[in-house]
Amino acid sequence: MQTGKQSVTFSNPVYITHAASVVGSKEGQGPLGNQFDLVVKDDMLHQDSWEEAESAFQKKAVDIVMEKANTNPALIDLLLAGDLLGQSIASSFGTADFPVPHIGLYGACSTCGLTLLNGASWIAGGHAKKVICVTSSHFASAEKEFRFPLAYGNQRPESSTWTVTGSGAFLLSGKPDKIANISSNKSNSNKQTSSISADKCNSIKNVRN
């Protein structure tokens, strides 16, 4: 139901039941380092190109969110994915191994919110029961696409914009679920679970009027 000029309220609530994050080494060194599920040391993830590495980040994020939910692709109705690259190639190849209908979305820095809004609409409308939303970026591939390719050797101050190397994935459902716990300490495996009890899950809604 439309609320105001820019907001939508769903009659059927939609929940983020699980979330996963995979980031590069620089992100792991920042103030949020202990909040990520996986911090990798090799930003290339043993791939041959930055674009392939970004795809690998997406795949890992989706794998982790499904592992947290104890589910598999057969139980997922739709996968919404997006990235910063031309033709969304990171998403196309990153999700290629998942036998799930895939819709690619592009919203630059708003891609995460865009996938969540669209995924929630599918569920609230009764067209899907479980939807995975995933987005990614990679510092090196973004530099190549929008700024100065690393091979150019451009000098950059530490205060300049730095695109995240990482990926985030969410599992949406029309039914709430419980997550194991909320922790503030990074484990040795760099894995972290965070969730909220089912009775406190709020439906996804755009509250801006």
Short names for language-model regions:
Residues 1-103, 162, 168-209:
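Conserved "HGTGT" condensation-loop signature of ketosynthase/thiolase-family condensing enzymes
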Residues 85-87, 109-111, 138-140:
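A short acidic, glycine/proline-enriched capping/turn motif at secondary-structure boundaries
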Residues 136-140, 145-147, 176-177:
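Short acidic/polar capping segments at secondary-structure boundaries
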Residues 82, 131-137:
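Short beta-strand segments
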Residues 88-94, 114-116, 142-146:
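Short, conserved acidic/polar surface loops in the N-terminal third of protein domains
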Residues 3-6, 120-123, 155-161:
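A generic local secondary-structure boundary/capping motif
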Residues 106-133, 172:
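Active-site-proximal alpha-helical scaffold in enzymes
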Residues 99-102, 143-156:
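Short acidic, glycine/proline-enriched helix-loop-strand junctions
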